[in-house]
Amino acid sequence: MAKLVEKFYSIMGLGDEIEEMNDASVAPHSGEERESAFSRRSAERAERTERPTAPVVSLVTERQKKELKVVVCEPKTFDEARAIADHLKNRRQVILNLEKADREMAQRVIDFISGTTYALNGSMQKVGANIFVFAPSNVDISGEVTGDDLSSVRSPLAWANKG
């Protein structure tokens, strides 16, 4: 049986190590030598496992700072709508002020940006006369501005009052 075990160890490439281990275990050691050998091994293991510590950066905080940006846009032409849509794609909130825009251009911009918002699973809220908030999916808009709150401000965009 011993030959079978030795043969198995030699196949596995462990034959020489077992002989060395047996020789080492037979040699008598004093108590101090055992303690020093043990402490030396544990110190070596500790050195191998210790890694230099690096400063820890909180990724959540950095990510939240990026996501909390709000972009205020007041487009003069429809061509600026694409840049506004890019802000939403980059997960930034957009406040769109169309008070100075002509009706046709404002309607086209609202249609384009609301389509982008829908495609990105975002949300849209009217907060004033011709002022809208568009938010990506990572931001929830809470609260509603009722028609009574906006009654003092006359909106030239009748279609925007439907909410």
Curated annotation (Swiss-Prot):
Residues 25-53 are annotated as: Disordered. Keywords: Cell cycle, Cell division, Cytoplasm, Septation. The keyword Cell cycle applies. Pfam families: SepF. GO terms for biological process: division septum assembly; FtsZ-dependent cytokinesis. Its main location: cytoplasm. It is found in: Cytoplasm. GO terms for cellular component: cytoplasm. Residues 30-51 have a biased composition (Basic and acidic residues). Homodimer. Interacts with FtsZ. Belongs to the SepF family. Cell division protein that is part of the divisome complex and is recruited early to the Z-ring. Probably stimulates Z-ring formation, perhaps through the cross-linking of FtsZ protofilaments. Its function overlaps with FtsA. PANTHER family: CELL DIVISION PROTEIN SEPF. This is Cell division protein SepF. It comes from Heliobacterium modesticaldum (strain ATCC 51547 / Ice1).
